């Protein structure tokens, strides 16, 4: 089942009057449990473990092609994770593909600790595409990334168990009528902000 429909991260839709289209917004539970990031250990997370964790807790699940996965743990539970992959943009070396905390937890200085550790692994010249539907851009600014530009909202097709970008739908030559008749709902995200770290 798609994590967007789990109790931790519930999908909500709202009508935007100016565009008359359905926008996908993800609701996150408030971060009520505070954990000091300095009391946790930084680990390099195995790709399979990282994928399982992200599939459970991140609205879009695990990305493909991770080169480096770092997490903060107490030895039992991973509370915070950052994953990096080769950048799609040739101007940048690495893309920060996921930056996420365990639902309802606020890991104090968690992202700072992980980004400092990533630099020790030689990660530099980073780009991040921040999905405004569910990510907080101030988290990226807090680790020293700088805003570069915005990307317009993107159309997605969703069911309770799956999601597909409109570009993938067109590439597979699936018509809008086919998607609607098979239970897919067209929604738009809230756009993206591009952040960079040199």
What are these regions (language model features)?
Residues 1-22:
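BZIP DNA-binding basic region
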Residues 11, 47-51, 155-156:
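A short acidic, often aromatic-flanked loop/helix-cap motif at beta-alpha or helix-coil junctions
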Residues 23-64:
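Short amphipathic alpha-helix that is part of the acyltransferase structural core
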Residues 41-44, 73-76, 80, 84-185:
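Acyl-donor binding region in acyl/amide transferases
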Residues 67, 190-194:
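Short hydrophobic/aromatic beta-strand or adjacent loop that forms the aromatic wall/cage
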